[in-house]
Structure formats: structure tokens, C-alpha cells
């Protein structure tokens, strides 16, 4: 099992990916303890001195002007968690819940939240024991933070709600007992610290980013395979073309294509002196389109990595000055906009792949048998597989609609502008699945096309990509049940079968 020492505010993208993919044993670096304790001492001083501070001894939202008596402060925090656990929809899977929990721990341990070390350690214990709170997927608008999802997470700490332990849904109290853990009682400020934050939104978008990286790599490999299958030119990948424009994403994308295609291959030599002057855009403009997508991936990475290490609580405790200040770090607009831009990239990766599939279907453009199968008429070949790819590409166009431009006021107009970041991030998962399906069809089609160039081979790396598929999916000599082959290729893509053929590009 992966073991990780968490130094608050210093999580890397690779660490976040590992948390998402695998269970983790987490420990908090000792450097965080003094800051955590200082913020708690500041909160305790405010209570002891009878000062009024939002979230510590007041109500919440529109009720922020209501002063809460000291004897009700503990009940205030518990009531906050219970009342805000109002999510709906299917439960998030363990991987997503684990990522949200680690992001929450990372934020709280920065020492600006006034939450005791013992509560943070209780969250760490949930992660280490594999106790996963039941968090419904829907119910947050991304301001004031992800209240409902984080309330459902926090229920388990209190021994309320449900949690999954060793694959079984149990009452949280029972799950804690089986894992050898005890519920906690929250002190002043702690319920609000647990609930306020962008951790669900950020986790949703991070999953989208992780999947987009795999899709980008897979599409580059399949685009290179298609270039070979239809006897496309290597000239559009010439480094001088891309240096002249100066777009770094484009320059780097072209380099990836050159890495795969190398200088030549038996296929390339076979049409070295052909009559074609230019290839269609779906081949010739791959560096330009994929480079623009790569730029979006990199910008999204920058935003999400900053947010993963951010303090998005409210109010914030500045212990050195003895102050508690209300602000708006819970507003997930940066995450929403990043997710919107990532959606455009995922849609375009799939759209370009679908156009290359369509190109291979047309015998006049591809110089291959119609629909990539011999004895056409009796055999339909890839005819409907291309239709499936077109359907998926079209779905993604609607899903790519920006969420960050939408807003509905909540909390009696106190919270009058919200980000919709959770929905912006969550739809990326469906878009990624659609695009992976498109690329799977292209992989099948491109390998079939190269097979049909009998006796000719591609570059070593592209032959490796073809062999990886052919170990699981046979060449099409005649029509057969097609869906299992798409499913097989899709599974291989999700496992990173093609991504590993490329150097790091992020």
C-alpha cells in the first residue's frame, strides 16, 4: 500500500493521482502541528474573551448576525453538519471519496482553520482504515464551498450517516467500530471548517484532468497510427513549421508525433513519391489542434494544483495577529473555469479522432477498402462503429457547454453568485468516457488499416501499439459482434496501454 507523508500545501500532481488510484497510508508531517495548535488557541481566546466572530459563535449564511451562547457552541457545530448533509444522487466511489478526504486534510492542516489536531488525525484515520463516507454526487453549487458533500463526509466523523468499509455499506457508527475508531465531538469553528472548502469540486476536476491526460496521449498515438494507415505525410510534423508559429503546446505536440513516427517506415517509403500535395486537416493539423488541447491541460493542471494546496475555508484564522477574517476563498470559480476549459479540450480530442475515423471509411480518401473490410456488401466492417464514434462526439458538444457562466442565488440571496464547479467537474467524467470510446474505435480502425497494407510495417513504437491491440483483438476478415472489441480497446486505453509509449508531456 502507498505510504505518504503529507506536508500541508505541498501535494504534487503525481501524489494526487496516486491517492485517486490506490489506497494510501497517510501521516501528517510534524511541521504542521504548531500552526494547527496556534489557530485553535486563537479560536479559544475569542470564545473566552466573549468576542463575536462569524462561524465561531454566530449562525451561518443569512443567520450570521445571530449570536450563539457559549453553552450551545458544540451543538451548533454538530447541527451544522447534520443539517447540511442534504445531498442527492449516487454515492461517489471510494477513489473519489479518498481524494476528497486527502484534499480536506491538506487544507485543514495548513493552520488557518481553527480545527484541533485530534480532528484532523481522525480524518487521517478514516483514510488509513479505508472507511469511506457515503457522499452523494450531487447537491453542491461550488459556493459557499462544497457544503453538502463535505457535510456527508463529516457525518462519519460524528458516527452518523453511512460509510463503506471493506466494500460493505454500514451505519457509520458500525463502520467506525469495525475499523477500531471512535466518533469525535466537534468544538467551536470545527464543523464549519470541515464543511467550507472546494475539495469536492477540486477532486471532481482532478479526475477529469487525470483522464484527459490519458486521452490526449492515446489520441496522439492513434492519430499517428491513422496517419500511417491512410498513407499520410510526415511533413506537417516538421519542427520548423511549429517553431515559426511559436505556440509551445503545438511545438510539443508535433514533437510527440515525430517521436512516434520517426523519420520513416516501410509504409512511409511506399508512398514517398505519391501525387498527393496535402492531407486533410484531421491529419495535417493534428499538432495545431492537439497542441491547443495540451495547452488547456497544462493550464488546468496549474489551477487545480494550486487549489488542491489552497486554504478554501471561511472564515480564516490568522493566529499571529489574533484575527479571524471572513472572505470568499470557498468560491470555486477558478475550478469551474478550469473544468470548462478542460471540457473543450476533451471534446476536441474526441472530435478530431472521429474525423480521422470517418476519413478511413472513405475509400477515395484512405485508399483502403470501404469501411476497412474486404468483400464489402456482404461485410459492413466499421460502418456502424464510425456512427457510434459520431454519436459520442456529438454528445460531447452539448456536455462542453460552460458551467461557470451559470449561477443561481442561494441562502436567501446572501450567497447570490455561485460557481457551479461541482457540475463542471463531474460532467468531465462522462465526456472522458465518450472520448475514450471514440479513440478506441480509431485504434481498432487504424490497426485494421495498417493490416490491410499487407507486407508493410510502421515505426517501431506504432508497431508496438498495434501489437498491444492484436494480442487482445483479432484482425477483421469478416463481420463479427463488434461491441466486445470496442469494450476491450476501451479498457486497454483506460489502463494506459498507449500513454506509456510517450514521454512525459505535462
Swiss-Prot record:
5-imidazolinone (Ala-Gly) crosslink, residue number(s): 143-145
Gene3D superfamilies assigned: Fumarase/aspartase (Central domain) (1.20.200.10), Fumarase/aspartase (N-terminal domain) (1.10.275.10)
Pathway noted in the entry: Amino-acid degradation; L-histidine degradation into L-glutamate; N-formimidoyl-L-glutamate from L-histidine: step 1/3
PTM annotation, UniProt: Contains an active site 4-methylidene-imidazol-5-one (MIO), which is formed autocatalytically by cyclization and dehydration of residues Ala-Ser-Gly.
The species this protein was found in: Salmonella paratyphi A (strain AKU_12601)
Annotated EC: 4.3.1.3
Taxonomic classification: Bacteria, Pseudomonadati, Pseudomonadota, Gammaproteobacteria, Enterobacterales
Stretch forming the signal peptide: none
A Gene Ontology cellular-component term: cytoplasm
GO molecular function, one term: histidine ammonia-lyase activity
Cross-referenced CDD domains: PAL-HAL
Source organism superkingdom: Bacteria
Listed name of the protein: Histidine ammonia-lyase
Keyword annotations: Cytoplasm, Histidine metabolism, Lyase
Catalyzed reactions per annotation: L-histidine = trans-urocanate + NH4(+)
Pfam families associated with the record: Lyase_aromatic
Record's keyword annotation contains Iron: no
InterPro entries cross-referenced by the UniProt entry: Aromatic_Lyase, Fumarase/histidase_N, HutH, L-Aspartase-like, Phe/His_NH3-lyase_AS
GO biological process, alphabetically ordered: L-histidine catabolic process to glutamate and formamide; L-histidine catabolic process to glutamate and formate
Modified residues (2,3-didehydroalanine (Ser)): 144
Amino acid at each position: 500500500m502507498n505510504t505518504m507523508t503529507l506536508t500541508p500545501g505541498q501535494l504534487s500532481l503525481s501524489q494526487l493521482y496516486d491517492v485517486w488510484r490506490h489506497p494510501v497510508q497517510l501521516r501528517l508531517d510534524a511541521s504542521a502541528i504548531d500552526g494547527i495548535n496556534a489557530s485553535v488557541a486563537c479560536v479559544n481566546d475569542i470564545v473566552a474573551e466573549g468576542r463575536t466572530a462569524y462561524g465561531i459563535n454566530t449562525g451561518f449564511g443569512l443567520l450570521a448576525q445571530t449570536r450563539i451562547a457559549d453553552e450551545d457552541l458544540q451543538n451548533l457545530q454538530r447541527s451544522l453538519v447534520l443539517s447540511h448533509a442534504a445531498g442527492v444522487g449516487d454515492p461517489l466511489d471510494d477513489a473519489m471519496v479518498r481524494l476528497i478526504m486527502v484534499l480536506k486534510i491538506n487544507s485543514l492542516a495548513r493552520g488557518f482553520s481553527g480545527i484541533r489536531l485530534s480532528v484532523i488525525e481522525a480524518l487521517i484515520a478514516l483514510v488509513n482504515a479505508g472507511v469511506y463516507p457515503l457522499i452523494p454526487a450531487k447537491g453542491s453549487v461550488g459556493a459557499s464551498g462544497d457544503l453538502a458533500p463535505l457535510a456527508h463526509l463529516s457525518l462519519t466523523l460524528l458516527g452518523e450517516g453511512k460509510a463503506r468499509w471493506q466494500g460493505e455499506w454500514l451505519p457509520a457508527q458500525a463502520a467506525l467500530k469495525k475499523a477500531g475508531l471512535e466518533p469525535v465531538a466537534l468544538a467551536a469553528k470545527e464543523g464549519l471548517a470541515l464543511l467550507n472548502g472546494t475539495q469536492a469540486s477540486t477532486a471532481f476536476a482532478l479526475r477529469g484532468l487525470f483522464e484527459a491526460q490519458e486521452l490526449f496521449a492515446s489520441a496522439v498515438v492513434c492519430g499517428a497510427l491513422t496517419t500511417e494507415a491512410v498513407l499520410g505525410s510526415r511533413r506537417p510534423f516538421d519542427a520548423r513549421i511549429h517553431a515559426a508559429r511559436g505556440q509551445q503546446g503545438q511545438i510539443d505536440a508535433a514533437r510527440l508525433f515525430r517521436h512516434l513516427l520517426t523519420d520513416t517506415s516501410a509504409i512511409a517509403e511506399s508512398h514517398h513519391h505519391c501525387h498527393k500535395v496535402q492531407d486533410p486537416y484531421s491529419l495535417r493539423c493534428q499538432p495545431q489542434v492537439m497542441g491547443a488541447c495540451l495547452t488547456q491541460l497544462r493550464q488546468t493542471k496549474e489551477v487545480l494544483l494550486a487549489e488542491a494546496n489552497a486554504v478554501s475555508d471561511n472564515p480564516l484564522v490568522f493566529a499571529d495577529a489574533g484575527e479571524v477574517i471572513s472572505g470568499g476563498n470557498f468560491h470555486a470559480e477558478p475550478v469551474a473555469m478550469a473544468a470548462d476549459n478542460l471540457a473543450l479540450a476533451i471534446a476536441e480530442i474526441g472530435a478530431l479522432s472521429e474525423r480521422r475515423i470517418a476519413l478511413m471509411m472513405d475509400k477515395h480518401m484512405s485508399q483502403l477498402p470501404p469501411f476497412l473490410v474486404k468483400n464489402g456488401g456482404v461485410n459492413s466492417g466499421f460502418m456502424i462503429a464510425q456512427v457510434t464514434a459520431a454519436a459520442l462526439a456529438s454528445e460531447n458538444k452539448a456536455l462542453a457547454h460552460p458551467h461557470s457562466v451559470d449561477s443561481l442565488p442561494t441562502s436567501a440571496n446572501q450567497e447570490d453568485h455561485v460557481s457551479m464547479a461541482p457540475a463542471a467537474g463531474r460532467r468531465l467524467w462522462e465526456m472522458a468516457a465518450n472520448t475514450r470510446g471514440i479513440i478506441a474505435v480509431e485504434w481498432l480502425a487504424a490497426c485494421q488499416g495498417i493490416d490491410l497494407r499487407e507486407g508493410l510495417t510502421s515505426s517501431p513504437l506504432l508497431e508496438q501499439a498495434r501489437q498491444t491491440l492484436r494480442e487482445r483483438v483479432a484482425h477483421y476478415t469478416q463481420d463479427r459482434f463488434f461491441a466486445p472489441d470496442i469494450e476491450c480497446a476501451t479498457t486497454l486505453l483506460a489502463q494506459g496501454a498507449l500513454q506509456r509509449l510517450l514521454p512525459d508531456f505535462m
